[in-house]
Amino acid sequence: VHLTADEKVSLSSLWGKVNPDELGGEALGRLLLVYPWTQRFFDSFGDLSSAVAVMGNAKVKAHGKKVLDSFSDGLKHLDNLKGTFASLSELHCDKLHVDPENFKLLGNVLVLVLAHHLGKEFTPQAQGTFQKVVAGVANALAHKYH
């Protein structure tokens, strides 16, 4: 992902305000609710029958944190996202059989959650920067698909 110096500063500053414990669960929970067909990949998570169940689900929160921790790692390697996410791409492709379109959906949900939590600090320019990054991460995660 190519970012300008200003975009990198903005990205770093805003991401420093993110709490992966909180936002990860919210982003994954919203994905599962807005795009309910994604729930089939999370059969082991227990009750996902309602918004209250999904958003309060400890496994959703824990996996959401894990997702954002991986995303944070990717932010440290913007020049090598495919390498950074190679093993996760392989896992999601070969073992989990996740439709790579879901990575784009989750990226867009994450941008929405960031906008909600960061408020006025999440300017249109910041949104543009994050959209570039989530698109790059989604592309990297889809890299191992045939």
From Swiss-Prot:
Keywords carried by this UniProt record: Acetylation, Heme, Iron, Metal-binding, Oxygen transport, Phosphoprotein, S-nitrosylation, Transport
Q: Which residues carry this modification: N-acetylvaline?
A: 1
Purpose:
Involved in oxygen transport from the lung to the various peripheral tissues.
User: A single GO BP annotation from the record?
Assistant: hydrogen peroxide catabolic process
MF term (GO), any: heme binding
Q: Residue positions of the PTM S-nitrosocysteine? A: 93
Origin organism is Tamias striatus
Instruction: Supply the name of the protein.
Output: Hemoglobin subunit beta
- The entry's heme b-binding residues are 63, 92
Q: Which residues carry this modification: N6-acetyllysine?
A: 59, 82, 144
Which protein family is named in the record? Belongs to the globin family.
Q: Which residues carry this modification: Phosphoserine?
A: 44
Give any Pfam family that matches: Globin
Question: Any idea where the Globin domain is?
Answer: 2-146
Q: What is a single cellular component term in the Gene Ontology annotation?
A: hemoglobin complex
Quaternary structure, from the entry: Heterotetramer of two alpha chains and two beta chains.
Do the record's keywords include Metal-binding? yes
Q: Where does the entry say this protein is expressed, by tissue?
A: Red blood cells.
Q: Which PANTHER family match?
A: HEMOGLOBIN FAMILY MEMBER, HEMOGLOBIN SUBUNIT BETA
